């Protein structure tokens, strides 16, 4: 917040665009200033001063990395969707001309060369791709080019977060120097512990963490394939249980629910009903006043420490229910783990000198136990608020939260920054609510009566971060300042809203999974006599529970769950099939022609699709009669390839992607609406982050099925936005292959998908809408 106030003091004498960006981010945009060609470009000096000042204020743990090609590309990120002005949707020429002059702020990332020449100079992108690809693998180069969509942080040294780390409360939150009696204030702690020893031995936490695997079992998990079984639960639906060890197979939902069966640590048993009451139905039975039906079944699985994949998370309906459930599970795990350490501290303090025992092995090689990956700062803010609410027994017993004010300032949002008449779909508003900066990481340390925000990672119990925030601290091979030792002993990994990372940069998620649960390069002052044997044997990954939540089924998300999760207890995946697809929500009268592409293998699909498009599909639309043709392209790589081909063939087209400036977007939309351009290439990530209504569509081509099934109906329904009276000529063509089975089922339904994939015919027709 302080940066924003400082920015307002510098607002005098700035242009409209600069004042707008200064109000949003508290600093001048370095890319805009560098390429604008206006006298205001000298404002870069002020940005440098602010940046230096901020660096001086940050502590020694601040991540300062060399400015590489990766960081330069990341530095070109732009403002969030909520920074759009009210006149975005206005199609008039006068206002669009005004936007071209005064509203050149972001729509994603701008390439420096592209910014100089405007929309028509976007051929420079492939050249930069080649430069990056020379140093990085293809997936990483793509991620660097895309640079995570609507990032609100415009730091020119994007790889370095201006971090604050709390160093004042180290002793107060140290697990090595505190004891159970001091933490709980209960003189009868030992007596209570002895009375509940039998119950504690039945605790799923105790059973899971104290299990000692044999080498044969580890080898079996590593080499053999999993055996799976099916089960149907009342709320979750069809479940697939898989495990390598035969004794860990299926699980049945509890018919009779008892709070004691949850083994919740104090004070969660008393605070949870108050925190969760907002999501409970007034018609619920008294016995169901603890969980919603969804939470009950999810927590039943979570509490057994199995891996869980739930691909039906919806930001509008059940998103917060799920967030509360996994926060309860994570906090319960942390409180139990810390209580065990503090209790053993007291026992070890009282034991006779010279006596060693393996009974006190209760820790990992590093302290962080829970890693929570979320897409935006707003998500981290909500998680911390849930933690605080769960730890506060009542209004009189508030817990001490260090650096709470700073946390609210950096992770909160200003409601006045959002344009009042910005109209977007409800699901968009739910996903992009609050602070949508996607570059952050924060450590949280918890004891029963207090919480420490901004704790150093090696003194944290929980790390909440975005994939980009983790990527910039993990670094890459050869970088001097990189660190991932703090990930060595992660016992619980929670990846929420995994589908959004497909729109940001999936390579960051893969990079994280490759660096989790590795042996640390340094000891970091650990007491090896307290470290569990599985951690010393480098078997941490076999004990890690992974909770994966997504809004959709996707092969890349499935690969994370199948190839990077090794939990010895087993895995549970929700595998419900869509009975009716999103095509049923298309309201316009429209023939949908689905054309199947025959590809020999998965790697050849990309080239086969391109060749099929230019040989079979595009010639049908070259005629001037087939004007107003929108081509929807999910992959940015395919978009660049098509754009270059269209330019080579000198076709009359325009294009919009996540890197296009607002002025270019306005020109493209206007020329497409008026018919000046026959084709419009549109990327899926642009639609995800902006959700503009593209007017003037008469012919629609889905180069590939959309990642989000509801995007299919949204794009099709855009045709009704133009009252041209020529709806009889509307067409829709969709390309698909047998490798698109999940996406196809989400669009047309599982029954039609089976017929379309097994049929000898390669063309299938569906008609939507009512006859007039």
UniProtKB/Swiss-Prot annotation:
GO terms for biological process: embryonic organ development; maturation of SSU-rRNA from tricistronic rRNA transcript (SSU-rRNA, 5.8S rRNA, LSU-rRNA); positive regulation of embryonic development; protein catabolic process; protein destabilization; protein localization to nucleolus. Pfam families: Utp25_C, UTP25_NTPase-like. The keyword RNA-binding does not apply. Residues 1-200, 588-650 are annotated as: Promotes p53/TP53 degradation. It is found in: Nucleus, Nucleolus. Residues 14-23 have a biased composition (Basic residues). Phosphorylated. Phosphorylation is required to promote p53/TP53 degradation in the nucleolus which promotes cell cycle progression and liver development. Transmembrane segments: none annotated. Interacts with CAPN3; the interaction is required for CAPN3 translocation to the nucleolus. Component of the ribosomal small subunit processome for the biogenesis of ribosomes, functions in pre-ribosomal RNA (pre-rRNA) processing. Essential for embryonic development in part through the regulation of p53 pathway. Controls the expansion growth of digestive organs and liver. Also involved in the sympathetic neuronal development. Mediates, with CAPN3, the proteasome-independent degradation of p53/TP53. This is U3 small nucleolar RNA-associated protein 25 homolog.
């Amino acid at each position: 917040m302080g940066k924003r106030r400082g920015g307002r003091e510098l607002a005098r004498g700035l242009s409209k665009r600069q004042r707008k960006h200064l109000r949003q981010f508290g600093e001048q945009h370095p890319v805009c200033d560098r390429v604008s060609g206006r006298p205001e470009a000298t404002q870069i000096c002020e940005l440098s001063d602010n940046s230096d000042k901020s660096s001086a204020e940050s502590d020694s743990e601040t991540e300062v990395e060399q400015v590489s090609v990766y960081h330069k590309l990341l530095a070109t990120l732009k403002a969030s969707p909520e920074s759009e002005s009210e006149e975005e949707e206005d199609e008039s020429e006068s206002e669009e001309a005004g936007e071209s002059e005064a509203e050149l702020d972001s729509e994603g990332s701008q390439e420096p060369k592209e910014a100089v020449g405007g929309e028509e100079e976007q051929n420079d992108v492939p050249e930069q791709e080649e430069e990056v690809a020379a140093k990085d693998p293809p997936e990483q180069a793509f991620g660097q080019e895309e640079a995570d969509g609507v990032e609100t942080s415009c730091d020119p040294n994007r790889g370095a977060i201006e971090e604050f780390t709390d160093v004042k409360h180290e002793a107060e939150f140290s697990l090595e120097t505190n004891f159970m009696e001091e933490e709980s204030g209960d003189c009868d702690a030992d007596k209570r512990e002895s009375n509940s020893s039998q119950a504690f031995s039945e605790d799923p936490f105790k059973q899971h963490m104290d299990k000692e695997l044999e080498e044969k079992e580890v080898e079996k998990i590593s080499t053999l394939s999993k055996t799976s079984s099916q089960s149907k639960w009342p709320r979750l639906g069809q479940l697939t249980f898989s495990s390598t060890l035969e004794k860990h197979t299926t699980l049945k939902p509890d018919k009779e629910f008892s709070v004691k069966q949850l083994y919740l640590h104090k004070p969660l048993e008393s605070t949870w009903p108050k925190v969760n009451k907002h999501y409970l139905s007034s018609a619920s039975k008294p016995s169901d006043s603890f969980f919603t039906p969804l939470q009950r079944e999810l927590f039943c699985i979570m509490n057994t420490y199995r891996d869980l994949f739930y691909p039906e998370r919806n930001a509008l309906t059940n998103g917060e229910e799920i967030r509360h459930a996994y926060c309860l599970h994570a906090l319960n795990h942390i409180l139990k783990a810390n209580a065990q350490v503090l209790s053993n501290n007291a026992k070890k303090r009282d034991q006779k000198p010279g006596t060693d025992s393996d009974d006190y092995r209760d820790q990992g090689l590093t302290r962080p136990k829970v890693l929570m990956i979320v897409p935006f700062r707003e998500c981290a803010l909500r998680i911390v608020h849930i933690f605080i609410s769960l730890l506060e027994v009542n209004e009189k017993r508030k817990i001490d939260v260090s650096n709470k004010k700073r946390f609210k300032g950096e992770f909160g949002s200003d409601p006045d920054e959002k344009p009042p008449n910005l109209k977007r779909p409800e699901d968009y508003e739910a996903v992009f609510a609050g602070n949508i900066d996607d570059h952050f990481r924060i450590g949280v340390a918890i004891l029963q009566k207090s919480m420490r925000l901004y704790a150093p990672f090696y003194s944290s119990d929980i790390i909440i971060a975005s994939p980009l925030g983790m990527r910039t601290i993990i670094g890459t091979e050869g970088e001097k300042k990189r660190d991932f030792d703090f990930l060595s002993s992660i016992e619980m990994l929670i990846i929420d809203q995994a589908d959004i990372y497909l729109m940001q940069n999936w390579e960051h998620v893969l990079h994280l999974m490759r660096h989790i649960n590795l042996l640390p390069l340094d000891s970091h002052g650990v007491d090896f006599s307290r470290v569990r044997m599985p951690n010393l044997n480098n078997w941490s990954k076999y004990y890690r529970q992974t909770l994966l939540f997504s809004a959709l089924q996707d092969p890349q998300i499935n690969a994370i769950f199948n190839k990077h999760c090794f939990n010895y207890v087993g895995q549970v995946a929700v595998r419900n099939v869509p009975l009716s697809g999103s095509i049923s929500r298309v309201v316009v009268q429209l023939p949908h022609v689905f054309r199947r592409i025959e590809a020999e293998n998965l790697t050849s699909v990309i080239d086969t699709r391109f060749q099929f498009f230019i040989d079979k599909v595009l010639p049908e639309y070259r005629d001037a009669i087939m004007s107003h043709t929108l081509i929807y392209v999910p992959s940015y790589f395919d978009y660049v390839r098509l754009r270059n081909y269209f330019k080579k063939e000198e076709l009359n087209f325009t294009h919009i992607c996540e890197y296009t400036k607002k002025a270019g977007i306005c020109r493209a939309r206007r020329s497409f609406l008026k018919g000046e351009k026959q084709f419009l290439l549109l990327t899926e990530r642009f639609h995800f982050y902006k959700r503009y209504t593209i007017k003037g569509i008469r012919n629609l081509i889905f180069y590939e099925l959309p990642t989000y099934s509801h995007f299919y109906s949204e794009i099709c329904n855009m045709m009704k936005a133009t009252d041209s009276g020529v709806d009889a000529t509307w067409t829709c063509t969709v390309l698909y292959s047998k490798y698109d089975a999940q996406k196809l089922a989400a669009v047309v339904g599982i029954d039609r998908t089976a017929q379309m994939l097994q049929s000898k015919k390669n063309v299938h027709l569906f008609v939507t809408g009512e006859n007039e």
